[in-house]
Curated annotation (Swiss-Prot):
It holds the Pfam family MutH. The gene is mutH. Keywords: Cytoplasm, DNA damage, DNA repair, Endonuclease, Hydrolase, Nuclease. Gene3D superfamilies: DNA mismatch repair MutH/Restriction endonuclease, type II. NCBIfam families: mutH_TIGR (TIGR02248), PRK05070.1 (NF003458). This is DNA mismatch repair protein MutH.
């Protein structure tokens, strides 16, 4: 099994990501001696782990950007035949206790989304996992409007948590960012702030980017790319 080194510069990272574009997951897996699963029902994190390995990501599941020394978070994003994201994008686990003094600027969500390297990957279920193609990379930094929307949603969600109302939050809350249960199963529980400042047990929660938001990122990036190459 090969172990690629972590890129020292953004240019090196992007060069490696561009070299990967056009390959299938099976081809990439074979190059590292990985076994490609027949489906992803029991291996939901396999694609992300494969791409992380190829690009030399270091963070793993730690609450920091994947390429901390470059300030870049890596996100694989499955898309359908029309280029639309198939699912929401997980960002990080949500803090449910000890949140006094926490601000958007000091939050893990803010840090992880400062600069994101998006890797689109064919996600249609009728395409065998080994034959799904890796798309062109997108290096994205949120603009002022996107940052404002993210901050607004994060602050509203954290207010619910601080008031002990985490159980009232649904995936419908938030324009671009949502809070959803995050755990291996519904039996996973953790502490959270309860009514009147008490402590209660609840399912772990995670922050996710909504599909229309990630769709706008992809559309804008590939729209610019198309214009640039059609001159």
């Amino acid at each position: 099994m090969t172990t690629p080194h972590s890129p020292k510069t953004i240019d090196e990272l992007m060069s490696r990501a561009n070299d990967m574009a056009g390959l299938t997951l099976g081809q990439l897996a074979d190059s590292h001696g990985f076994i490609t699963p027949a489906n992803l029902k029991r291996d939901k994190g396999w694609v992300g782990q494969l791409i992380e390995h190829e690009l030399g990501a270091l963070a793993g599941s730690r609450p920091e950007p994947d390429f901390l020394h470059l300030g870049i978070e890596l996100k694989t994003i499955p898309v359908d035949k029309n280029g639309k994201p198939i699912e929401t994008t997980y960002v990080t686990v949500a803090p449910l206790i000890d949140i006094q003094g926490l601000t958007w600027e000091t939050s893990v969500v803010c840090h992880k989304l400062q600069t994101v390297l998006w890797i689109p990957i064919q996600g249609d279920r009728d395409i065998p996992v080994s034959q799904r193609q890796i798309g062109s990379p997108i290096l994205w930094r949120p603009n002022e409007e996107e940052l404002a929307l993210l901050k607004q949603d994060w602050e509203e969600i954290m207010e619910f948590i601080a008031l002990g109302q985490v159980k009232q939050l649904t995936a419908r809350h938030g324009e671009v960012l949502q809070l959803r249960p995050k755990g291996a199963n519904s039996r996973s529980v953790t502490q959270s702030i309860g009514p009147n400042g008490s402590t209660q047990m609840t399912n772990p929660r995670g922050f996710y980017l909504k599909i229309p938001f990630t769709q706008s990122i992809l559309s804008r990036a590939f729209g610019i790319y198309t214009q640039a190459t059609s001159r």
